[in-house]
């Protein structure tokens, strides 16, 4: 009975959520698009001509937002976006116009090599401008286990960013407040010159979800 009440309450909140309604109205696949939009509005992450990699992209709302932002550039002509968006996820994702999608686990060498090649082609052999990651583990409710899973996904994004970002590039990842959060922030500070946390209004009030932003890579000794 309690579970049914919880499900009914969640469904009621979801249906009446203004961001859900906005996403439906504006054609986004998930309300998460507005989390990225709020952060982008504040920090001016997405700029014309950028090459952007979206880790853990499904169902695709972040890729949609990034694509739309690049398409709005005055330099976008003949139906093409001004820049490139490369998305990857273990889960399938319906195509997004102008977005190159790879389905697979980028921890696997073959998939990683494919991702690297697509990024190289998109950037003309250069490094990339922005990595965004909305990856999240399946949470168990066991704090220590969940903290380790969250930190692991952040480490994957950090490693990818270190290897592929331009010196002036940025990394945005989803994280959760709790055990292990301070360690993740410290890792960002070791890797980036500027580090900030963001809690957009589109994040649900009851959620411990937050986003960590790193900008300007530090040189590797």
UniProtKB/Swiss-Prot annotation:
Q: Which reaction does it catalyse?
A: uridine(2552) in 23S rRNA + S-adenosyl-L-methionine = 2'-O-methyluridine(2552) in 23S rRNA + S-adenosyl-L-homocysteine + H(+)
Stored InterPro entries: RNA_methyltr_RlmE (IPR050082), RNA_MeTrfase_FtsJ_dom (IPR002877), rRNA-MeTfrase_E (IPR015507), SAM-dependent_MTases_sf (IPR029063)
A GO cellular component annotated for this chain's UniProt record is:
cytoplasm
Q: Name one Pfam family in it.
A: FtsJ
The reply on keyword Ribosomal protein is no
Q: Which family does it belong to?
A: Belongs to the class I-like SAM-binding methyltransferase superfamily. RNA methyltransferase RlmE family.
The entry's active site is: 174
Intracellular or extracellular location(s): Cytoplasm
Major enzyme class: transferase
Question: Where does it primarily localize?
Answer: cytoplasm
Its Enzyme Commission number(s) read 2.1.1.166
Does this entry carry the keyword Acyltransferase? no
The record's section on SUPFAM superfamilies has: S-adenosyl-L-methionine-dependent methyltransferases
UniProt name for this protein? Ribosomal RNA large subunit methyltransferase E
Q: Where does S-adenosyl-L-methionine bind?
A: 60, 62, 89, 105, 134
What does the UniProt record say this protein does?
Answer: Specifically methylates the uridine in position 2552 of 23S rRNA at the 2'-O position of the ribose in the fully assembled 50S ribosomal subunit.
Keywords of the record: Cytoplasm, Methyltransferase, rRNA processing, S-adenosyl-L-methionine, Transferase
Return one GO MF term: rRNA (uridine-2'-O-)-methyltransferase activity
Q: Which organism is it from?
A: Cupriavidus metallidurans (strain ATCC 43123 / DSM 2839 / NBRC 102507 / CH34) (Ralstonia metallidurans)
Gene behind this protein? rlmE
